Amino acid sequence: MKKQIATGYKMGNITTAKAITFFDVETTSLDPEKSAILQISIITDWEDGNQDVWTTKIKPRDVELNYASSEALKICGYNKDDWEDAPLFEEVAHIIAKKLAWGPIVAHNINFDIAHLKASFKRRKWREPERNEKFDAEKKMFKIGYPAIDTCALAYIYLPTERQNLDTLREH
C-alpha cells in the first residue's frame, strides 16, 4: 500500500524547471505568529550549471525576542553581539521575495519554513499577489514558488527510519 503524506502546501512536478531553489530558515521559536527568522539560506541551482548561494543572519527586534525559545536560540547559536550588524527582516525582504518567487522550491519540513516566511512578510504588511496580478517584490509583494518539495515527507516515504531529520538523512 502506498503511503500518503498530508501536507499543507502543494507538492508537484519539477520536470520542466529551469532552476530549483533550496532554502532553510532558523527561527526563535516554533510558533510562526510570534517568532522571528534569525537566519535564512537560499541556494538556486540553474539548469545551465550555475549556482546562486545567498545566506544572511537577520536581526530580530527586541519584542520578537520576548517570545523566543531558549532552546531555539541555542540551536541557532544566537547571541546579540553576532547579530548586532545583521539586517532587519524588512531590509532583506525584497531579496527573499525575489529568490523564492519561482518554483520549484525544496526544504526539509517545508511547511514550517513557509509558515514562518509568510508570517514574517505579513507582519511587515507585505502581501501575496491577487490572482492574475503580476508579482513585483518592489511593491511589497511576496510569492512562494511552486511546486514545493518537502524532503522530510520524501524521507518518511523512501527512508522509513525512526527519525527523518537531516542528520539521519546524511547518514544514508
Language model: regions and residue ranges:
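Metal-dependent phosphoesterase signature
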Residues: 74-95
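Long, highly charged low-complexity segments
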Residues: 3-14, 25
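A generic local structural motif
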Residues: 6-9, 91-94, 134-135
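Metal-dependent phosphoesterase core characteristic of DEDDh/y 3'-5' exonuclease domains
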Residues: 2, 13-20, 33-78, 97-172
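Short acidic, Gly/Ser-rich segments with clustered Asp/Glu that frequently serve as metal-coordination loops
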Residues: 25-33
